[in-house]
Amino acid sequence: MFTENQNNNQRHALKTEIKTVFNSDSGVTYFSILIETSSKMSLYNVIIKTFITQLQKANRECQIQIITYGDSVNTIFEFDSEPNELKDSLKEIKFSKDNEEAKLGEAMRMCFNNIESNWSSDLMSKIIIISSGQSTDDSSDDLVDILSLDNNSIYGLAGCNLANKSSDEAVKDLQSLLPDQKVIPLGKNPSQDIRLLMNGGGGAANGGGAANGASSSDEHSINCPVNIEVYPHTNETKSIKDDLLLDVVIKPDGNTASVPSGTKIKFLSNKYYSGYTIQLKQNLVFGEPYEETIKLEFKKGQMEKTQFENFPSKIIFHIELANDRDNVHEGFVALNISYFLGELKSKYRCCIGVEGEIGNGKSTCLNGFVNLFNPVGELEEYFNANRTSGTHVTTSINNTSLKEILSAKHYIHPVQESFHDIDIAWSDSWGFVDTDVQLRHKAEGRIHHGTKKDECTILQPDDRYRIDCFIFVVSIRNFTNPASMQRIEKKIKEVLQMNITPLLAITFSDTLSKNQLQDVMKNKVAELSVQESNTFIISNYTEKETHKDISKDVQYLRLLTKAVQLCKVKNEKDIMNKVKGISNLSINDNNNSFNQTPIKNQPFFESSSTSSPSPAFFRSPIQQQQQQTSTTSTQSPSPSSSSASTPPPPSQMLNEQPSKTINVTIDVVTDSSGTVLTSFEIESSTNESVSELKCKLINEIDPEMNANDWSITKESGTVLFESARLSSIIKSFDNSDSIKLVLKKKQKLF
């Protein structure tokens, strides 16, 4: 990891763009108007309806939704409704005479759902909340975060007709619900309120600010006089769940002498990160840039799938010049996925094999994986991708590791220096053919790099080519092909028989409608014995695409993160099995000692006429399995001779139940309030103890954590005995294949 000084010398700026948004927006703006209809707002009936009517007249091309909230929440006017129907809809706004309830939280969630289903992030969204400054439902916490979207602005109009509450108090109360958002009093002049809100003018005390400055703002509206450069705070790749630290450099452009004190650069919050505001404390002159490190906090508690779906492609910021409030200067910082790969770090080598029919996108998917580690914008091709149907482009096994790819480069980008803890290898293969060997040979490392399709020879096991996880890439078109589905199902069963969890990547899904895709996921995917949590929709890069798209990169990262997680689990399981094997070996030796049979000193694998264990017992599980299979096929020894020549398997010696793999969902809770810090899924064996599961979880979260400070509980709070096996615990769950537990920090007693 670079020190800060080294980092400053080698840092690379993220792509940043700034544009000026004129007050007369040429595009369609989506207005969401939330109206409190409690008795506290009844006197504003006419003012509110006039405000909405004039807002529509001032924005002819806008889309409007109106939601009322009191003791109930209702949408009285929807997006895409005919504009001439607005007048009749306004009659449905009814204010209560005595009810003071205001379910603002529920209204904002309804607003968010309506926006998300109708609105694109390329368009402008403006939310206007007309309120007395109260929220009476429990869901009112973090209201602004619910509506955190790119290109989205929130405004507040505060009023209250209670004799003991002034408009200033109402503004203060509403401002506490909408921190960092613009809130003004609801006045008697709707036109002025619209101008103040939409044009960035001051509050009621300086309401003429926007209009007064209009005549002198033309030169500022053409070009933004501020240059902004944004750098990652460190060149080390971080977890996608970490807070985002950015170094922001602000300076005047070449045509501007200075940037005035009081200028604000607001980095807007979104569904993934919190916001941040930089305010200049003094005038910024040319040649003396200002730099500040900002922290955008990761919003904890997101589920794994939602977490990746919410990850933003860019961070939106607004520039509010102290001497030009008439125009909004808007910009964005494009995020680079290579700085968010920390979840892929592992102390084990993770080898991932990709399988599927010809032309389904296997090699393209692998190229997507590798390009995650390419911080440059242009795509690179490491695996030969099939651009036609019916022709094998990949005709031999191609094993490539990240370390090999990076070592072949003449120049290493600074962030690539931090990939040393990421040890991933990929294995590309030809499309399924009838003469394919079983996948267990690939899992054992018996199919080596360079093996040709027509000369597939099973060789001695080599750890360099051992496959830890299999991803099946399936085109959406293949779900209607019975022969293809039969081959895929056969291969998936081969993986399941090895107690390896298969992953499914569905490609070319853009050829179906949303309803058609849901139908395939519900009816067809279920037939393949792959859990829904292990099924991924992947939008592969096409031949015409030459530059990276972070929305696609996030899909690749989510799939690769799951694959690496499964590889870690498998490697942990293999190590545990080896430890158990050695332990069982010691038990066997101790049992022999009671027979007082003399044992000669000899090398570990050397046979002895007086020693009962045969050399075969010390061989690898793969060799042992093959020998047992061969023996079974050639002879059928009597029970007495079999027990005398072959020691019992370790599981029988310890009287353990047959192991199976289950899916465990874990909520991490750090305080007594029960707030879930994060949630994730992990594969576990039923033969694992609660203690082993806890240690594995802590190793995944933070190896520096003290395991003694944590306990595993059920959702009800029941603490599980650490010596208990998962096989006994799952009996109390309705679904023994998938259970949910809690990793909870123990509370100290004083």
Curated annotation (Swiss-Prot):
GO biological process: aggregation involved in sorocarp development; cellular response to rapamycin; positive regulation of gene expression
Domain of life: Eukaryota
Region annotation Disordered: where it falls in the sequence: 586-657
Disulfide-linked positions: none
Domain VWFA positions: 17-249
One Pfam family this sequence matches: VWA
Ranges of Low complexity composition bias in the record: 586-595, 603-645
Assigned GO CC terms: membrane raft
Entries under PANTHER family matching the protein: INTERFERON-INDUCED PROTEIN 44 (PTHR14241), VWFA DOMAIN-CONTAINING PROTEIN-RELATED (PTHR14241:SF32)
The protein's name in its UniProt record: von Willebrand factor A domain-containing protein DDB_G0292188
